[in-house]
Amino acid sequence: MRYVIEMIVKALVDDGESVDIREVEQRGATLIEVRVAPNDVGKIIGKQGRTIRALRSLARIGGSKKNRRYLLEIVE
């Protein structure tokens, strides 16, 4: 799941080199932390949060196929 999110995020931002994705285990779920350059945060969130909602939906769907729970957060 990390690889899929990383490829999508790198395609969305201007500075693909600054993208850092980490997976952290938390209370029976896997938290995917996305770090990008400060000027790219708005591109990840999108208009009215549509882009981040879509990314979270992809993570949730991918997790359901593996019987896992994935959460996605943008970390500054």
Which functions belong to the PLM regions below?
Residues 1-43, 52-76:
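RNA-contacting regions in translation and RNA-metabolism proteins
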